[in-house]
Amino acid sequence: MAFSFQVSKMNSFDNYNAAIHPKHDLISVNAPVFGKDAKLSPHLAIVLADKGFMLEQVCLPWRYFTDRGFVVEFVIAESIFPPRPPKPNDSYMTGWKSHVLGASKEILDIYSVLCTLNEFNNPKCYRSNGFTFDNFSAVFITGGRNPFVREMLEDPLLHASLVPYIHSCRTIQPDEEVKDNRKIKVLGAISQGAAAIYLAEPNINMKTTTIPAWMERSNSFLNPTPDNSTYPYAATIIPKDKYVSGPYRRVAFTYQDENYYYISGRSNKDIGELSKKMYLMYKQAYKDLNASLRERRRRSTSNRRNSGI
């Protein structure tokens, strides 16, 4: 663990119940930002359910982007009362499933740090008045099959907030005349999280991967009721011409769209690579924007010279 900035703030915990019942008696602190100014640093929103999220899908992106100078904030549906940190899916935290499908010691360590942060203990709420994703440079949508996650992914208020952001992620073309106020916007989704995009904007010209039906079906057999439910599989929600299934085996697989700064993954196995590629996509978007602005200035200068100004 490289959390030198907060190791002293962590309490001892055990692998089974630390992530379910975080035991910290410290005042929440702000996450570190390694840039010169938090206000100037890019902001990432991790969209998650307040209960039942997958630890890997939240902890690893937070760690990766925080280490690269992002301000990472968390977005849930509405305020939690009585106040508590968002809770992960506890069906994988105890018993035999914790050994087969549960989070690693590293992930549990990261979660114990998250539970000391203001950003995690007081997440933003997309149902609140005036909320917008426009304040973020990157948005990452988590997935899951349990009722709490499903409610979030199908929420029309989440869709309403996502639609304008999705369109702001359109790829900048080399010859495009960008506006002065064009901002860098990138989007990522893991497993069922991709379904929220197509429920929000079913006709968008964007391709994605998500957890394949065969993988989601096999996973559901390991989940207790009501997780093993009649929810439609995520892959069936996405239009066939926009769905990229990936290999028919449990290997890491991500897919980046050509028309939008959007990248997606299928399962927790992909989350590390997905975080890395999403960050590289952000850097590429920044380069594309600067290149377009330089080209616009070059054309403007050339036109003035040709007109004798």
From Swiss-Prot:
Gene Ontology terms, MF aspect: catalytic activity
Pfam families on file: ThiJ_like
GO CC annotation: cytoplasm
Matches recorded under Gene3D superfamilies: 3.40.50.880
SUPFAM superfamilies: Class I glutamine amidotransferase-like
Signal peptide coordinates: none
Family designation: To S.pombe SpAC14C4.04.
Protein name: Uncharacterized protein C18G6.12c
Native organism: Schizosaccharomyces pombe (strain 972 / ATCC 24843)
Upper lineage: Eukaryota, Fungi, Dikarya, Ascomycota, Taphrinomycotina
